[in-house]
């Protein structure tokens, strides 16, 4: 189990840039990009101290000492793209989310010798949505993760290791009404 604790030697810094733009009637665009840095000032003992209980039980953890300085699950960059076109009673949307490389701790309780710190690849998720309004009713449909990006490594015994979709594209459709 994870217990979050402020260890007093971590720092986080970054810069965020964003732009929203309406280049023509019924069309909105937005872009957001963030560069992040999050590290501990020192290597974490559970990955770097040969005398720690974790390293005594699984000495291969010591190979990840340098990577343990990175804050787990904290991407080096993130970004979003939003495009929306709404002519009359129609609505079309395309959204995207970028996740940069990050370090993820994998702590296996069943097999501690497989514990490690994984550096992920950068990935992008894409979503679409189309809707048509008929008075107070609307019909809509769309897809999430339409290119079916999946994280390349899955460990069902450690929910904290999930950093990207573990299932492919999800498609949906529906009807809504306004009172």
Q: Which residues are covered by each model-predicted region?
A:
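Residues that define the transmembrane beta-barrel architecture of outer-membrane proteins
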Residues: 11-13, 75-79, 122-126, 167-171
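C-terminal beta-signal and adjacent terminal beta-strands/loops
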Residues: 97-110, 131-179
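Short amphipathic alpha-helix initiation/capping segments at coil-to-helix junctions
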Residues: 119-123, 130, 164
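Short, basic/aromatic-rich helical patch in the C-terminal catalytic core of site-specific tyrosine
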Residues: 17, 128-130
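Structural motif
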Residues: 86-87, 120, 133-134
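A generic, residue-level signal for flexible/boundary positions that often mark functional hotspots
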Residues: 1, 65, 112-114, 140
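Short, contiguous acidic/charged loop-to-helix segments that flank catalytic cores in large enzymes
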Residues: 6-8, 68-71, 113-120, 161
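Gram-negative outer-membrane beta-barrel transporters
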Residues: 2-107, 176-178
């Amino acid at each position: 189990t994870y217990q979050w604790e402020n260890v007093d030697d971590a720092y986080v810094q970054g810069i965020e840039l964003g732009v929203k733009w309406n280049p023509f009637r019924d069309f909105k665009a937005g872009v957001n990009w963030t560069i992040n840095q999050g590290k501990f000032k020192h290597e974490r003992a559970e990955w770097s101290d040969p005398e720690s209980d974790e390293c005594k039980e699984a000495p291969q953890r010591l190979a990840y000492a340098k990577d343990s300085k990175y804050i787990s699950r904290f991407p080096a960059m993130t970004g979003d793209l939003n495009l929306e076109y709404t002519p009359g009673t129609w609505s079309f949307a395309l959204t995207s989310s970028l996740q940069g490389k990050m370090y993820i701790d994998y702590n296996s309780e069943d097999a501690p010798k497989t514990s490690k710190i994984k550096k992920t690849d950068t990935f992008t998720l894409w979503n679409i949505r189309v809707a048509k309004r008929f008075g107070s009713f609307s019909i809509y449909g769309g897809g999430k993760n339409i290119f079916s990006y999946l994280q390349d490594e899955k460990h069902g015994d450690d929910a904290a290791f999930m950093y990207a979709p573990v299932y492919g594209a999800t498609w949906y459709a529906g009807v809504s009404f306004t009172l």
